[in-house]
Structures are given as structure tokens and as C-alpha cells.
């Protein structure tokens, strides 16, 4: 299979969406979204997005793209009064994504996926939601 960024996006979505504990923390299905929550979003919800992607990071000849290193962001939105809800969601996401082989599936070989950065939650004054942004670094290839 040829490399396509869609493959890693699908692996991230599937890993998050297929976890019943995370769906329970989110209050049901349909709350894991790509890029931006709609104005009428149900809270809590999370978005995910690939923010950078570099091919063949372990070789000077990057033309083959055999190993890819990507950074992606998962952002949690919660309209709870306190951060406990978003903290619990973040902890579950870390359990799912942080480590070796966490995004392996039929198309992806995930060499490792580690939480690279966690920003302290902030309260959006317009939407009155807590926003927690987490950046992950993943090294992967296609099968």
C-alpha cells in the first residue's frame, strides 16, 4: 500500500472511536471530530488533526517515504464547570495513544506514539468551554 496521510488519520480516529471507556467519558458516539467542532457541538467532544508530516526521517534519501514521523494534536472541549471532566478524558486518551505499537492496524505499522506536549486547560470566554490541547509524535509506516 502506498503512503497516504489519510491512513494515519483513520488509525487515530479508529483507536479513539473504538474505545468504549472514552466514548462513555464523552457521553456517547459522534463526539470525536476532525479539525474543528461545529457550532452546535455536543460537549464534551474531542478533535484530532495532523499538524506536520515528514517522510523517511531515518535516512538522508527521503524519496522512498518508508518511515514517516508525524505530529498530531488532540484537543478536548468540555463545558463542565471544572477541569475534572477534561482531565479524565485526557488521561484515557494517553492510555490509548502513548507507547509503542498503539496505532497498529491492517494498514499502519506504528513504531511508537508518544505524548510530546500537554498544555494546561484554558477557559474559552466565548464558548465557556475548557480547551485542553495535547500534541503527539508518531513514527509509522505502511504495511
Which role does the model predict for each range below?
Residues 1-62, 84, 100-106:
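Small/polar-rich, solvent-exposed N-terminal microdomains that initiate assembly or binding
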Residues 39, 63-65, 123-127:
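Sterically constrained small-residue positions within well-ordered secondary structures
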Residues 95-143:
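Acidic-leaning, charged glycine-interspersed low-complexity segments
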Residues 52-55, 80, 119-122:
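Short, well-ordered turn and helix-capping elements at secondary-structure junctions
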Residues 55-58, 77-83, 140-143:
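Short, cysteine-centered beta-strand-loop-beta hairpins and adjacent loop/turn segments enriched
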Residues 49, 68, 111:
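Divalent metal-cofactor coordination and adjacent catalytic microenvironments
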Residues 64-80, 93, 130-140:
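Oligomerization/assembly interface segments of phage tail-like spikes and tubes
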Residues 79-99:
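Extracellular/virion structural assembly segments
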Amino acid at each position: 500500500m502506498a503512503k497516504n496521510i489519510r491512513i494515519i488519520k483513520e488509525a487515530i480516529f479508529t483507536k479513539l472511536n473504538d474505545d468504549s471507556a472514552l466514548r462513555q467519558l464523552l457521553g456517547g458516539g459522534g463526539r470525536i471530530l476532525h479539525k474543528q467542532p461545529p457550532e452546535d457541538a455536543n460537549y464534551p467532544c474531542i478533535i484530532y488533526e495532523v499538524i506536520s508530516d515528514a517522510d523517511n526521517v531515518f535516512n538522508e534519501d527521503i524519496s522512498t517515504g518508508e518511515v514517516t514521523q508525524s505530529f498530531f494534536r488532540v484537543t478536548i472541549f468540555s463545558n463542565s464547570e471544572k477541569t475534572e471532566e477534561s482531565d479524565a478524558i485526557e488521561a484515557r486518551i494517553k492510555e490509548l495513544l502513548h507507547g509503542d505499537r498503539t496505532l497498529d492496524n491492517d494498514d499502519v505499522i506504528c513504531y511508537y506514539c508518544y505524548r510530546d506536549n500537554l498544555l494546561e486547560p484554558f477557559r474559552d470566554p466565548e464558548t465557556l468551554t475548557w480547551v485542553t490541547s495535547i500534541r503527539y509524535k508518531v513514527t509509522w509506516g505502511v504495511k
